[in-house]
From Swiss-Prot:
Binds 1 divalent metal cation per subunit. The lineage of its organism: Bacteria, Pseudomonadati, Pseudomonadota, Gammaproteobacteria, Pseudomonadales. A divalent metal cation binds at D8, H10, H42. This is 2-C-methyl-D-erythritol 2,4-cyclodiphosphate synthase. It comes from Pseudomonas putida (strain ATCC 47054 / DSM 6125 / CFBP 8728 / NCIMB 11950 / KT2440). Keywords: Isoprene biosynthesis, Lyase, Metal-binding. It catalyses: 4-CDP-2-C-methyl-D-erythritol 2-phosphate = 2-C-methyl-D-erythritol 2,4-cyclic diphosphate + CMP. Disulfide bonds: none annotated.
Length: 157
């Protein structure tokens, strides 16, 4: 059994939506990123790669590589799952915490869980996503960006 932790942050920029957990969410800002900016899926990918001792998403999908410009983070996550499975692991469960003052995540969390479970090829009860604020403290509290912490448990396949 292996445990990995993932963390990612993206700054807000001009835009009218963000993508989190594969869900397009209307917002007064977008997220600045080389890919689609899905900070949740990036943190989950890092947790999975970390648990399997396979580095991080920057190693596998460098932001200096033009082929990943605007990349769909769901496709990247599915690729990570393939790498992890090829090393003899399967997902036991994942848990993620979105840290954001806005937008409100509650209306979108179940859809995020469903899409993540689909991409990880696991049951819904193996995926947890929750959200919190920092009570208007720090960069997330000032609505400068979004952060996500995630944990993944891998089991021998």
């Amino acid at each position: 059994m292996r445990i990995g932790h993932g963390y990612d942050v993206h700054r807000f920029c001009d835009g009218d939506f963000i993508t989190l957990g594969g869900v397009r969410i209307p917002h007064k800002y977008g997220l600045l990123a080389h890919s689609d900016g899905d900070v949740l899926l990036h943190a989950l990918s890092d947790a999975l790669l970390g648990a399997a001792a396979l580095g991080d998403i920057g190693k596998h999908f460098p932001d200096t590589d033009p082929q990943f410009k605007g990349a769909d983070s769901r496709a990247l996550l599915r690729h990570v799952v393939g790498i992890v499975k090829a090393k003899g692991w399967k997902v036991g469960n994942v848990d993620a915490t979105i840290v954001a003052q806005a937008p409100k995540m509650a209306p979108h969390i179940e859809t995020m869980r469903q899409l993540i479970a689909e991409d990880l090829q696991v049951e819904l009860d193996q995926v947890n996503v929750k959200a919190t604020t920092t009570e208007k403290l720090g960069f997330t509290g000032r609505e400068e960006g979004i952060a996500v912490h995630s944990v993944a448990l891998l089991l021998p396949a």
